[in-house]
């Protein structure tokens, strides 16, 4: 609903939409605060250093071969996939297809729809994968191929189909990445390892978005998408 509402930015205006979002966020925070119970300070116990907890999770991943390799794949997913998506899709909408906010909102919705469909399917099939790591790598390859086709400036209907499939492949990667992270991490350190997973995915996405912006500024949107797609496929 939020994506569709943002699609009306050209008609409503940016300031009213941001104001509405602030009201909704404040309302959600107030409702969440009222729905949570209160714990006495004495029952919370003594908490250790957050920095020490973070470093212990990083050290565990560093010395665990399978977890380290998994985090490298997750980081590649964020760096080459989501980073490019964050920067390239708005520019592709405006500069290549000469469209506005409603078109971009439709792309966002299509991508998220692909992720939701993939998650529903993976929930049913995740226990049947004998080699989930190979499926994870295959999803990375498939996304690279989708980007290469997208760089050829396809018609609008094919673009949306590619975005849907791209979102589906991204959903597969995220779902399997989380599942493998939970399976491989020791019970005692699971929360810390999951935090490393989040850091690998979204931290690498931030760097990937920055580099994607420089690549697009240097060679153009379509060329940058094709180049990064070929890099992912390799």
Predicted regions, residues:
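Conserved extracellular-gate-facing transmembrane-helix segments in secondary transporters
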Residues: 3, 77-86, 170, 205
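Short, hydrophobic secondary-structure boundary micro-motifs
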Residues: 34-35, 42-44, 69-71, 88, ...
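C-terminal membrane-cytosol helix-exit motif in multi-pass small-molecule transporters
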Residues: 23-41
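Pair of pore-lining "gating" transmembrane helices in MFS-fold secondary transporters
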Residues: 62-83, 164
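Membrane-embedded alpha-helical core segments of multi-pass
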Residues: 2, 24-28, 84, 118
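C-terminal transmembrane bundle of multi-pass solute transporters/carriers
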Residues: 6, 15-24, 55, 62, ...
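Hydrophobic alpha-helical segments of secondary membrane carriers
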Residues: 1, 73, 196-200
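Juxtamembrane intracellular "pre-TM" segments in multi-pass secondary transporters
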Residues: 38-72
């Amino acid at each position: 609903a939020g994506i569709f509402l943002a699609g009306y930015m050209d008609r409503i205006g940016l300031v009213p939409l941001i104001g509405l979002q602030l009201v909704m966020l404040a309302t959600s925070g107030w409702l969440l605060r009222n729905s949570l119970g209160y714990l006495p300070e004495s029952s919370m116990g003594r908490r250790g250093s957050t920095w020490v907890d973070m470093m212990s999770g990083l050290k565990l991943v560093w010395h665990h071969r399978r977890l380290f390799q998994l985090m490298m794949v997750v980081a590649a997913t964020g760096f080459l996939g989501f980073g490019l998506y964050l920067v390239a899709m708005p520019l592709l909408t405006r500069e290549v297809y000469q469209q506005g906010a409603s078109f971009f909102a439709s792309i966002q919705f299509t991508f998220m729809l692909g992720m939701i469909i993939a998650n529903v399917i993976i929930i049913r099939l995740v226990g049947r994968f004998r080699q989930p790591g190979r499926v994870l790598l295959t999803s990375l390859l498939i996304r690279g191929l989708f980007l290469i086709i997208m760089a050829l400036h396809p018609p609008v209907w094919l673009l949306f189909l590619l975005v849907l499939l791209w979102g589906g492949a991204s959903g597969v990667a995220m779902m399997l990445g989380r599942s493998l992270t939970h399976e491989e991490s020791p019970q005692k350190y699971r929360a810390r390892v999951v935090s490393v997973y989040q850091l690998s995915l979204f931290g690498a996405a931030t760097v990937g978005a920055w580099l994607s912006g420089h690549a697009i500024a240097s060679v153009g949107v379509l060329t940058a998408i094709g180049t990064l797609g070929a890099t992912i496929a390799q």
